[in-house]
Amino acid sequence: MKTLVVLCTLLSIIFASPLSLKSPLVDDFYNPPRGYESAKLGEILKLRKTPGKISSLFIPVEVKNSWQLLVRSEDSFGNAAAIVTTVIEPFNADPSKVVSYQSWEDAANIECSPSYGMQFGAPLSSVQTQVDMIFIVPLLDKGCFVVLPDYEGPKSTFGVGRQSGKATLDSIKAVLKTKDFSGINDDAQVAMWGYSGGTIAAGWAATLQPKYAQELKKNLIGAALGGFVINITATAEATDGTLFAGLIPNALNGLANEFPDFKKRMYEVVEKRYEGALQQGTQHCLGGAILHFAFDQVFTGDHRYFEQGYGLLEEEVFNRTISGNSLLYMGQEYLPDIPIFVYHGSLDGIVPIPDVHGVYKNWCDWGIDSFEFAEDSLNGYLTEIVVGAPAAITWLDARFDGQPVVEGCKKTTRITDFSYPNISDSTRNFFKGILDSLTASQLGPGVTSDNVTLSGLTGFMGGLSKFKKSV
């Protein structure tokens, strides 16, 4: 009976007309007030409850509160900027625990911002944020406040490291000033977590923090980075002409949104017949880009967008911009001052692991205090998203519990990251989180929910599949 209720509810949601949410393009909340430039970094410029309910897989989830903050930040050049960050409070939240989750937005379009895409009623184009919300549910179920910054900022600068890192740090500064309405302690422990494109933000935040946000040293307890993106060129080479070729035009346009000289040169040298195709990289969120650009050859083949191919990346403006936003090429002054946990699949065909080995060697040679590297020999990019998540959650739990971190550097290669030590509870909570999101259960420690069983859910999914085939 429970399964039938869930099935009927889900079907009504799937086939109902989407709720009306204002796009960031027309929502005045995203526009900073006059004179905001004089505000301090991390200062809250505007505050509101999220217009729509938080949702996962386009199904509302029950949390106690959620807010959006407009926060003073800056771009790569130090120019004033205002970014939106979302704060989610679960039931029975622990005001001393905050996780800053950097979603894998991977788009050069502000309508792909997490603050918009995580709400019930968001368009189907926001599917990547809705899927990413699955990984946030277990954190909420553990009582952590979760913060999701629109780290690409108002210009949608996908791939731009400093913009993303600064926005992440400024959003954390802002959240630690919300005690009056959120209850979050100003001395709360804060951890960062991101996968793939989210590691551009979390990774750069970790490297910028010692100089850009020294005051956060007492709060930050570590960063978990999965599918660690540290070399934009390597990802372009790995994905050109593949199913994930859409990452390339999205990233090129994200860089162009921040660097005018890069944009000017890029559109000067693109083959005229492909100029419109390249511009489409500003129109699609990640899911749409994968579909639209599937198997396109941007740098290779007879129908490549750029006649020079990869040789174009050696031009001064291209080389300077791309290498300047790749952590692989950053010097010792970018060494993180907080514990780092990296989990990565050996078979990753989108974010190749050799460059991650390079960053591991560099940071360890330079004397990083704590760097734990979990390499999964059985999994690649897509499967490690799920397989590595319980390891990340386990590592985050240990940080919040005050357990000792790795001293210096430690790299372990396992057949699967499911065998990461002490992962059993985390695995159960992770998959329970997925179940809770599907059944719209109240989230928070100690909350009793009327959930369907796992076998019931399996049957429900099978029934849904048959239903869709019959209509």
UniProtKB/Swiss-Prot annotation:
It holds the Pfam family LIP. GO terms for cellular component: extracellular region. Its main location: secreted. Residues 1-16 form the signal peptide. It is found in: Secreted. Its EC number is 3.1.1.3. It is an enzyme of class 3 (hydrolase). It comes from the Eukaryota. Glycans are attached at N231, N319, N422, N451. It catalyses: a triacylglycerol + H2O = a diacylglycerol + a fatty acid + H(+). The active site is at S196, D348. Disulfide bonds join C112-C285, C364-C409. One of its GO terms (biological process) is lipid catabolic process. GO terms for molecular function: triacylglycerol lipase activity. Keywords: Disulfide bond, Glycoprotein, Hydrolase, Lipid degradation, Lipid metabolism, Secreted, Signal, Virulence. Induction: Expression is induced during biofilm formation. Expression is induced in medium containing Tween 40 as the sole source of carbon. Expression is up-regulated during the yeast-to-hyphal transition. During host infection, expressed in gastric tissues, but not in infected oral tissues. PANTHER family: LIPASE 5 (PTHR34853:SF1), PTHR34853. Belongs to the AB hydrolase superfamily. Lipase family. Class Lip subfamily. Lipase that is able to hydrolyze both the neutral triacylglycerols and the monopalmitate ester Tween 40, allowing the use of hydrolyzed products as carbon sources. Has broad lipolytic activity, which may be important for colonization and subsequent infection, therefore contributing to the persistence and virulence in human tissue. This is Lipase 3. It comes from Candida albicans (strain SC5314 / ATCC MYA-2876) (Yeast).
